């Protein structure tokens, strides 16, 4: 139904199953919006002339669109960043101080772990909750016993980028709300997939990227900050307002947006959000679950395939991670790409502790991630390729 902008490469149909890395293909209106912005707008907030005002309208329009999409209190709750990584660095360094205690999990991406390691060296206490072999975290039994008098925040990913398993966000949110803790959510995999209503949610800070489930371009993302929560900026400088003050503006969103915005990227992101709204979150999620469920059911029938993660509930992202006979995942991914033009992700997925929990630290995992633009036929072709690879010996890949 939504295949009018599929791409054929070298005369063959490319099967792109790396949607968790970046969505592809992008809606044509994304690129169109970016090009139009390059030719029709100046610098947002940097002048009173037509070109500058046009830029300000583009930035505000996208901000308002995102606020409505996420159910935020108002557009000023949304600040633009380069990506989810910048948003997470901003959130963690902006709320935690030496002597504070923060809780996270083994599910996390390095975009959470590495900033926390730096903060730990500066005096922040860090607790990492273990994951099960299935890639889940038992929050009800683990969180209460890890609470300390100086606990300030909990930061978790909404869904693992390795297995696709989603956490019990409601439990964690209520736990934070009841104890006055700051709840920071990494929505890199769930923005554009999960329907948020932030003004009614216990989420205090939501970090998202634009180039995955929101179908925007790479290089633009954002951070939602609930009114009443203060986040110190990572950078200060030009803001377009309060020029003669020695301090950077403290009000949102200017507080977190020093310097020139990526206006073409922001325009493209708005076009991506418009696309998601037009298709419908519910429809996207249902189609992606249908594809994921079908692929999981069929791939587990292939000899030598081990699948990771919990598939007992449709409350998950469209990801299936697996290995074949314990072969190194990078070799399997390379074979799929070179022999079948099937593009996947292998290795550690920037989530080292999760691979430790899954027991895949040495070989990594072969990750298939889908979007509603993928088809059953593409998955059938992929399953045939996996049956082929499964029938081979290790030496065949060397």
Question: Model-derived features: where do they sit?
Answer:
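Pyridoxal 5′-phosphate
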Residues: 1-398
